[in-house]
Every structure is written in structure tokens, then in C-alpha cells.
């Protein structure tokens, strides 16, 4: 079963809309995934950060998203962090010896976040 717990409030989207976007991304990125437990915390982060992801246990993840950003950036950050969920579920971890933007995990996450956002916006229109 896929469990999602949203903590906090994002003023520009309802929690049900955030859940809808979450499940859209999971179905696009991990269509056969059956076991997943994700906590999405909406909070204030460092000024240069829009989101974080950490795997805390098998199938268990935490995502933190900056609450003070526009709706498109918020969704983009959500999709970006869900790409990291997929990566760690597949056993792919970031190489912190490389500069941030040269890490294969970040290159993939930035590419897929844009593809997901484009498809999401199309489906919502």
C-alpha cells in the first residue's frame, strides 16, 4: 500500500490537490510500486532550498518542501523530490563527491521534474 502523510499547509493548494499531484508523479515514475510510505512536510527551509528528500527506512521516505514559493515552483519541487524517492527505491544514491549540478541523480531529477510538470499542467487544463 502507498501511504502519504502531509504535514503543514501550503496556502496555494489544498492537501487533496497535493495528494493528487503526488500520486500522479508516483504513477508516472513507479507504476508498479506497491509499498511506499512518504511523509511530506511543508515548512520553511533555507533561503536557497526548495525541497529535501531522505530515505529513513525500507520503503519509508521524508520530503520537506518550502512553503514560501509560487505554485509552479512548489509542484516542481515536489516532483523533483519524488524522483529522488524513485532513485533510492531503486538503490541509486547521489555521489556527494561531485558538484551538485553534475551529480547524475540531480541531472535526472531536474530533467524529470520538468517533464512531470508539463504533463501535470496539460492534464489539469
Q: Language model features by range: what are they?
A:
Residues 1-11, 33-48:
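Hydrophobic or amphipathic, alpha-helical segments that drive membrane association/targeting
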Residues 12-36:
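Zn2+-dependent metallopeptidase catalytic core
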Residues 14, 18, 75, 105-108:
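Hydrophobic (often cysteine-bearing) scaffold residues that line and stabilize catalytic clefts
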Residues 28-35, 92, 120-125:
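Surface-exposed helix-capping loop/turn segments at secondary-structure junctions
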Residues 39-62, 71:
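Catalytic zinc-binding patch centered on the HExxH motif and its immediate surroundings
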Residues 61-78, 101:
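Short pre-active-site segment immediately N-terminal to the catalytic Zn-binding motif
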Residues 82-96:
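Catalytic Zn2+-binding segment of zinc metalloproteases
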Residues 97-125:
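Post-HExxH zinc-binding segment in Zn-dependent metallohydrolases
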Amino acid at each position: 500500500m502507498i501511504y502519504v502523510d502531509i504535514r503543514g499547509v501550503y496556502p496555494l493548494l489544498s492537501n487533496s490537490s497535493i495528494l493528487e499531484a503526488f500520486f500522479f508523479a508516483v504513477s508516472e515514475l513507479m507504476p508498479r510500486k506497491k509499498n511506499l510510505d512518504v511523509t511530506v512536510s511543508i515548512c520553511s527551509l533555507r533561503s536557497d532550498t526548495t525541497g529535501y528528500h531522505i530515505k529513513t527506512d525500507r520503503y519509508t521516505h521524508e520530503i520537506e518542501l518550502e512553503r514560501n514559493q509560487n505554485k509552479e515552483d512548489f509542484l516542481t519541487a515536489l516532483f523533483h523530490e519524488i524522483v529522488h524517492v524513485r532513485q533510492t527505491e531503486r538503490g541509486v544514491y547521489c555521489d556527494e563527491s561531485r558538484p551538485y549540478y553534475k551529480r547524475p541523480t540531480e541531472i535526472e531529477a531536474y530533467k524529470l521534474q520538468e517533464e512531470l510538470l508539463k504533463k501535470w499542467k496539460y492534464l489539469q487544463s
